[in-house]
Each structure stands twice: as structure tokens, then as C-alpha cells.
């Protein structure tokens, strides 16, 4: 028989930097899960990634205090800011532009995000990324 699921926990954890401090500790502790076991497993899985890159993770907690977790791709906004070389988006996105993004950069981000996007093909994914960039006040060239 399958294990009984008691809940899901959604967190954004920096790659390679999971530790028992908030927000991880309290979220897992409430469900009675082994915090250090998750931290070690997460850090091992994110070893090859850029340290500090926020990784969304969905933890499935089971009744027997065990768990599994699924890592998603980093948020599009983080990847866009990194590619455009800006610290944060514009306060007035449609009037003040803070950076530029080329089509090649948008395609690279779309390829990274493809597993989590609902886009039908790469072109649709690129347009989705371009729309996110525009809403952050970043000009997109070639789209």
C-alpha cells in the first residue's frame, strides 16, 4: 500500500545552502520531519548549481515521518536579473527601463525554465520570458 501523505511544504531554498534555521527548520519541524536529513539531501542535489541561486522545492510529507522532495527550476525573475546584470527590477516598469535582454539570453532562460513552463514550444516559452522581463522594466531586443 502507498504511504499516506500528510501534507506538502513549498519553500525557496538557496542552492547548496540549506540549513536548519528558518524558514526550513520550522516548516519541517511542524510536520515532525528530519530537518538535517533534508538539508544534507538538498545540498547534495544542488552541489553542481550556482551557490545561493534560489531553488523552489516541494516537500511531500508522509504519515510515517518520511518525506520526498521535488526541485523546480529557479524563478524566471532571478534568471532575467542575472542575465541583464541588474540588482532589481524597475519601480515603474513601463516608463523607467533598467536593463536589456537579448533574444539569445531569453532563449537560454526559456530552455532552463522549459520543464516548469506550460508553453507549447520554445518560441512560446521565449515570449513568456520576454513578457516577464518587460514587466520588470527590462527591454527585450529582437522579440
UniProtKB/Swiss-Prot annotation:
Please outline how this chain is modified post-translation. One or more lysine residues are methylated.
A Gene Ontology biological process noted in the UniProt record is: translation
Q: Keywords for this entry?
A: Methylation, Ribonucleoprotein, Ribosomal protein, RNA-binding, rRNA-binding
Bilayer-crossing regions: none
Question: Where does the secretion signal sit in this chain?
Answer: none
User: What are the annotated GO cellular component locations?
Assistant: cytosolic large ribosomal subunit
Q: Which domain of life is it from?
A: Bacteria
Molecular function GO terms recorded: large ribosomal subunit rRNA binding; structural constituent of ribosome
Q: Name one Pfam family in it.
A: Ribosomal_L11_N
UniProt cross-references to InterPro entries, sorted A to Z:
Ribosomal_uL11, Ribosomal_uL11_bac-typ, Ribosomal_uL11_C, Ribosomal_uL11_C_sf, Ribosomal_uL11_CS, Ribosomal_uL11_N, Ribosomal_uL11_N_sf
Q: How is the quaternary structure described?
A: Part of the ribosomal stalk of the 50S ribosomal subunit. Interacts with L10 and the large rRNA to form the base of the stalk. L10 forms an elongated spine to which L12 dimers bind in a sequential fashion forming a multimeric L10(L12)X complex.
Q: What does this protein do?
A: Forms part of the ribosomal stalk which helps the ribosome interact with GTP-bound translation factors.
Family assignment from sequence similarity? Belongs to the universal ribosomal protein uL11 family.
- Indicate what this protein is called per its UniProt record: Large ribosomal subunit protein uL11
Q: Whose protein is this, by species?
A: Bordetella petrii (strain ATCC BAA-461 / DSM 12804 / CCUG 43448)
Q: Which gene encodes it?
A: rplK
Amino acid at each position: 500500500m502507498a504511504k499516506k501523505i500528510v501534507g506538502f511544504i513549498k519553500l525557496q531554498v538557496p542552492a547548496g545552502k540549506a540549513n536548519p534555521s528558518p524558514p526550513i527548520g520550522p516548516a519541517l519541524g511542524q510536520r515532525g520531519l528530519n530537518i538535517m536529513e533534508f538539508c544534507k539531501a538538498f545540498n547534495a542535489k544542488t552541489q553542481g548549481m550556482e551557490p545561493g541561486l534560489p531553488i523552489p522545492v516541494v516537500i511531500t510529507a508522509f504519515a510515517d515521518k518520511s518525506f520526498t522532495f521535488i526541485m523546480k527550476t529557479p524563478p524566471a525573475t532571478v534568471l532575467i536579473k542575472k542575465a541583464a546584470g541588474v540588482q532589481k527590477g524597475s519601480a515603474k516598469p513601463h516608463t523607467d527601463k533598467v536593463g536589456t535582454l537579448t533574444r539569445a539570453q531569453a532563449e537560454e532562460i526559456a530552455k532552463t525554465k522549459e520543464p516548469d513552463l506550460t508553453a507549447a514550444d520554445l518560441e512560446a516559452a521565449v515570449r513568456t520570458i520576454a513578457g516577464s522581463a518587460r514587466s520588470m522594466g527590462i527591454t527585450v531586443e529582437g522579440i
